[in-house]
Amino acid sequence: MISLRTHAARSLLALGALAAATSAAAQSGAPDRAVVGIAAVYTPGYQGGDDYRLMPFPVIDVTYGRFFASGREGVGYTVLDGSAVKVSAGATFVPGYRRRDAPVGVGRLDGGAGLRVAADMRLGEVLVSMSATKVVSGDVDGALVDASLAYPVRLSERLSLMPSVSATWADSQYNRAYFGISAAQSAASKLPVYRPGGGVKDVSMSLSANYRLNDKVSLGATASLSRLTGDARKSPIVVEATQPSAVLSVAYRF
């Protein structure tokens, strides 16, 4: 099973937010939508790694009433859908990493399901998003809090851009599962034992573009740069603290 890396997930989130904003502006009054497509994702094998992968990933964004399902937000229900504030709750996938991507001896970290609560607010032209995720299955553990600021700009009837900045806080359980080195892993990998604490684990910036070929088909692109911070950056598994990622996509709206 292909797991979406944290960097690529963030890039798809930004790209999806821009596409949704563009679609809403172009087709107001039609809240239900079904968008499918394919994306080419360039991403590190894991946060902090120095090997990169180019892989395909499906684009899915379905909304029916207050229910939604998408590759960027998971599946869930919109509890509050106001003109300036939207609050939702649901479940999403929290990625781990493959054995072949991690340093020798560290082993595989299976991703799992997470329960997610999110709030999106519009402050003038600025989009503010916050979410909290509690991991409930898999080898990954703990909780994550994400916050982002974005500024969508419509350059023409077809072309929109959106720069954004974001940060992720992780508790000690998550950081120990993802970035920690246990005694057994230390013996197998020759890396030192490491028990990180919680804190802001990364900050990122991205630029997304969406181009509507027509009312049904759109092209998307996102380039992102993320930097690990705090105890996550000090982990023995971190080779590159600053990592790029990119997504190119084509999507069809039914």
Curated annotation (Swiss-Prot):
Give start-end of the signal peptide: 1-26
Q: Where in the cell is it found?
A: Cell outer membrane
Q: Name one GO cellular component term.
A: cell outer membrane
**RNA-binding among keywords:** no
What main location does UniProt list? Answer: membrane
Matching entries from PANTHER family are given as: MLTA-INTERACTING PROTEIN-RELATED
Q: Which SUPFAM superfamilies match?
A: Porins
Membrane topology per the entry is: Peripheral membrane protein
**Keyword terms, alphabetized:** Cell outer membrane, Membrane, Signal
Pfam family of the protein (one): MipA
Q: Does the keyword Endoplasmic reticulum apply?
A: no
Q: Which family does it belong to?
A: Belongs to the MipA/OmpV family.
Q: Which domain of life is it from?
A: Bacteria
Intrachain disulfide bonds = none
* Name this protein carries in UniProt: Putative outer membrane protein CC_0351
Q: Which InterPro entries match?
A: MipA
